[in-house]
Regions:
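Short charge-dense sequence patches
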Residues: 24-25, 36, 135-138, 161
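Low-complexity, compositionally biased segments
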Residues: 7-9, 155
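Canonical Radical SAM [4Fe-4S] cluster-binding loop centered on the CxxxCxxC motif
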Residues: 60-68, 105, 110, 143-167
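A general structural-boundary detector
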Residues: 43, 90, 140, 148-151
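Accessory C-terminal segments flanking Radical SAM cores
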Residues: 3-5, 12, 17-124
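Recognition helices and adjacent regulatory flanks at domain boundaries
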Residues: 111-147, 159
Length: 167
């Protein structure tokens, strides 16, 4: 796979004789690798986490609703901040080529055939060589160490998230 981790942002590069978005190109390359595992595989379920402190909820992507981090799971293993049973079930579905219903936004985007879904972009954001293999080895039961961590300390939206604001 031709991938350059040192390229940041959305640079225009000459690719195959024409100028294209390097970010989009790299996301397409990562998507090809994801699809070798399954057509529903997404690295975000393993390696992205948003933790909402005031509500005790978590999610790996901003499209699905966040879900409660069960206190009993957290008492047994503090990695349940990210590795909840719910997320592990979703990972199992993805490994088996089943589309988790909570990821409907991406499935609708992909089914439209008009553009890449956030499955490609969120996976590309954390991608590094060997990460797909690591996720496969962890399977649905392993405890993944996130590469992207977002902690929300209050519920107020100030439109300053990276996906709402360029600042």
């Amino acid at each position: 796979m031709k991938y350059n981790r040192n390229i940041k942002g959305n640079e225009l590069r000459k690719i195959d004789g024409k100028f294209e978005s390097r970010y989009m190109h790299d996301a397409e390359v990562v998507l090809e690798e994801l699809n070798k595992v399954s057509p529903s595989f997404c690295l975000a379920k393993w390696f992205n986490v948003s933790i909402h402190i005031p509500t005790g909820k978590t999610h790996s992507c901003y499209h699905p609703k966040s879900h409660l981090i069960p206190k009993t799971e957290l008492e047994d293993d503090n990695s349940a901040l990210h590795n909840t049973k719910h997320k592990k079930e979703q990972r199992g579905m993805m490994l088996n080529g089943i589309r988790p219903p909570e990821c409907e936004f991406c499935w609708q985007t992909e089914d439209s055939g008009s553009q890449l879904s956030d499955r490609a972009y969120r996976s590309k954001d954390v991608y590094e060589p060997g990460l797909i293999e690591e996720a496969k080895q962890l399977g649905m039961d392993g405890n993944a160490r996130p590469r992207y961590v977002e902690v929300n300390f209050n519920q107020a939206c100030n439109f300053k998230c990276s996906y709402c604001s360029p600042h």
